[in-house]
C-alpha cells in the first residue's frame, strides 16, 4: 500500500522466489487493482531441487512455467516475462519461439532478459528478428556501486538496442547501507548474520565493507543516507530506466523513496570512481558463481 500510495506501479517477482510463494502473495496484493500495475515475473531458475524439468528455458518448461505463474498470480496475463538466466543447453530459437507463442496467445505482453551477458543480448535480438518475435524491452542486470562490470558490455548493448535497464540489488544485498563494519560481527538478523549463501560468495568482503563505510561518511556529510547515495548513483546513469527495490521494513522503504530527490554531483562521481574503477567490481574475484564466466571453458553444445 505504501508503494502504491507513493505512485509506484511496477512490481517484480519470479516463479523461483520462495518456491512460488512470492507470486501468490504478489497476486493477492494487487488483485483488486490489477490494471494499475505493470507486473513482471521470470522463468528459468529451478523452482524445486531434485525434480526433473522444473527449470531452464526449454519450450516445454517455458510454456508450463508461464501457466503456473499465471495461476499463482491470479491473472490472465503477465506484463513483462523475464528469461531469469541464460540456458546454454537450450537452443536460443527454441526459447524465443516459445516466448513468441506466449505473446501471440495474449499470456505475455512483453519479455525481457535477466543476468544475460552483452553478447547474448545481441544474439537474442538477432534471433527475435529472424523468428519474427517481438524483441525484449528490458534487461535486469546485477548492477550497483560494488559491481560495475555491466558497464563494459551489458549496459552499452542495452543502450545500443534501446532496451530498458532495471537494475537489481541496488544496495548490494545490504552492504551499501553501511550496516556491516570491517572486522566486526554482522548485525543480528541481517543476511550476513544468517550466512546467506549468495552474499557470502559475493558481497561479504572486508574490502567492500570499507568502501561502503567511506561512501556512507561522504553521504552523511552531504545530508544523505548511504542508501540514498547508492540509489542516486544509479539514477545518475542515463542508461538505467528503473531500479528493483526490495526493502523489508517500512523504514527501509522510506529511505528508498526519498532517494528519488537525492542530488548527484561531479564530486560524488569522482569519489565513486576512485573507490571502484568503472567497469570493474570492488575487489578481484567479486562475481556471482551462480552466473559463471565462460572464457576459460566451453559453453554447453547446442
Question: What label would you give each PLM region?
Answer:
Residues 1, 23, 27, 66-70, ...:
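Generic structural signal for well-ordered alpha-helices
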Residues 1-41:
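N-terminal binding-site loop/beta-alpha segment at the start of enzyme catalytic domains
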Residues 3, 11, 26, 39, ...:
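Conserved, mostly hydrophobic/aromatic
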Residues 5, 48-153, 160-164:
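Glycine/proline-rich, positively charged
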Residues 36-48, 140-141:
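A short, structured active-site edge motif that brings together acidic residues
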Residues 43-45, 117, 143-147, 169-176, ...:
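Glycine-rich beta-alpha junction loops
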Residues 150-190, 225:
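Aromatic-lined glycan-binding groove of carbohydrate-active enzymes
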Residues 184-217, 221, 236-241, 250, ...:
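Terminal-tail/helix-coil boundary detector
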Amino acid at each position: 500500500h505504501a508503494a502504491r500510495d507513493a505512485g509506484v506501479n511496477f512490481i517484480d517477482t519470479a516463479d523461483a522466489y520462495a518456491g512460488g510463494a512470492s507470486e501468490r502473495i504478489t497476486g493477492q496484493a494487487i488483485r483488486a487493482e490489477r490494471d494499475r500495475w505493470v507486473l513482471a515475473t521470470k522463468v528459468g531458475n529451478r523452482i524445486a531441487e531434485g525434480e526433473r524439468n522444473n527449470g531452464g528455458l526449454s519450450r516445454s518448461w517455458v510454456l508450463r512455467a508461464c501457466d503456473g505463474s499465471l495461476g499463482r498470480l491470479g491473472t490472465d496475463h503477465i506484463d513483462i516475462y523475464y528469461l531469469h538466466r541464460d540456458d546454454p543447453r537450450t537452443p536460443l530459437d527454441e526459447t524465443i519461439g516459445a516466448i513468441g507463442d506466449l505473446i501471440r496467445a495474449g499470456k505475455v505482453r512483453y519479455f525481457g532478459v535477466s543476468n544475460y551477458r552483452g553478447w547474448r543480448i545481441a544474439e537474442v535480438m538477432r534471433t527475435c528478428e529472424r523468428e519474427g518475435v517481438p524483441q525484449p524491452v528490458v534487461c535486469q542486470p546485477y548492477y550497483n556501486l560494488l559491481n560495475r562490470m555491466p558497464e563494459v558490455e551489458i549496459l552499452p548493448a542495452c543502450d545500443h538496442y534501446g532496451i530498458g535497464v532495471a537494475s537489481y540489488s541496488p544496495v548490494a544485498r545490504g552492504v551499501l547501507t553501511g550496516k556491516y563494519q570491517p572486522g566486526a560481527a554482522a548485525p543480528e538478523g541481517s543476511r550476513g548474520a544468517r550466512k546467506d549463501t549468495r552474499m557470502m560468495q559475493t558481497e561479504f568482503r572486508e574490502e567492500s565493507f570499507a568502501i561502503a563505510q567511506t561512501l556512507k561518511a561522504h553521504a552523511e556529510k552531504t545530508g544523505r543516507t548511504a542508501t540514498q547515495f547508492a540509489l542516486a548513483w544509479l539514477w545518475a546513469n542515463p542508461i538505467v530506466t528503473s531500479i528493483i527495490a526490495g526493502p523489508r521494513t517500512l523504514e527501509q522503504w522510506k529511505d528508498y523513496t526519498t532517494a528519488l530527490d537525492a542530488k548527484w554531483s561531479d564530486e560524488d562521481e569522482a569519489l565513486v570512481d576512485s573507490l571502484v574503477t568503472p567497469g570493474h567490481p570492488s575487489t578481484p574475484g567479486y562475481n556471482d558463481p551462480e552466473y559463471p564466466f565462460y572464457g576459460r571453458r566451453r559453453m554447453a553444445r547446442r
